[in-house]
């Protein structure tokens, strides 16, 4: 019932409209009320079709080439996901869909951005997608490669006090990855299974 509290939804709308970000997974803001299932469907650019929903044109173009899906080589795993999600509004972009229904949608709302996932089970790839979604929703995509590795099975940890960087292979297989520091490609690394490689941060 919090989602039909006008103060709650107005506060969130104001936050996003002024440049904030919103990320929803599954059934965020769900509460059937006044013809909407998602009470912030205008912010997210999606709603869920219910048995009594009005007929809506759901045949949309899917554009998988987006900042959030860069470095992603295989299909996104949405798990069981939430069914019957359709995009709506004037400022959305569908990044993944299943038939006529949407699975991953980004939306512009005022000066802000939202990202909607029908589902997001844990996996290294989904962790990377979520990371990219956070930077996108925050309106800071250019900041992501401040310290960054391209391979989803690798990660980077920074120790600024010692100017050292640890690049870690989280998998049981050899992995190749590109290391970016302050937006510049610094080195291409080949890491043994579970290897942690120390790199000097000379930037």
List where the protein language model places each region.
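A conserved amphipathic helix/loop scaffold
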Residues: 3-203
